[in-house]
């Protein structure tokens, strides 16, 4: 990549490239949603700083578990680095990387715990992954995870949602 000014610092490089994408999207009447894809705190900070400098309205979307999808990884502590921009929380509620939604699994505690944590950051919304490579959980037992997430989002009783699903 040949930049006009090769002396840009890390924040300025992210800002320069993302700014081009942001301006292009705006010119086309579209909205840019950015993903930090950072596993090192310093990188996350510099990326969110660059995004903030471009536009405080640009949506930052990131996973609710830190680094990647896993039932054993911690919640995303980097959310606290997002100061100005709205947050879209990305969730995996069908086991995209641990069973493709094929293995029967109920993620009640995982969904409830991560949802409660994310609500501390007043997210603009949630994006839930519900399939992988054509596999999805609609119409089988794993649809329960969609119903649990739906109950969380709507402030309904999770136990009642589970009971209704299995009734």
Spans of model-derived segments:
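Active-site groove signature of glycoside hydrolases
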Residues: 1-8
């Amino acid at each position: 990549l040949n930049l006009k000014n090769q002396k840009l610092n890390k924040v300025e490089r992210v800002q320069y490239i993302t700014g081009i994408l942001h301006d292009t999207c705006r010119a086309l009447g579209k909205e840019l949603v950015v993903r930090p894809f950072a596993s090192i705190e310093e990188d996350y900070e510099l990326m969110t700083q660059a995004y903030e400098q471009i536009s405080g309205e640009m949506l930052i979307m990131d996973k609710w578990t830190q680094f990647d999808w896993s039932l054993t990884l911690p919640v995303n502590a980097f959310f606290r680095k997002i100061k100005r921009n709205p947050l879209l929380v990305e969730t995996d509620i069908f086991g995209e990387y641990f069973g493709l939604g094929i293995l029967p699994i109920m993620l009640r505690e995982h969904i409830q715990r991560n949802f409660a944590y994310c609500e501390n950051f007043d997210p603009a919304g949630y994006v839930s992954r519900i399939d992988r490579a054509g596999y999805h959980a609609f119409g089988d037992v794993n649809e329960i995870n969609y119903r649990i997430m739906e109950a969380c989002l709507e402030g309904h009783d999770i136990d009642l949602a589970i009971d209704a699903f299995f009734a």
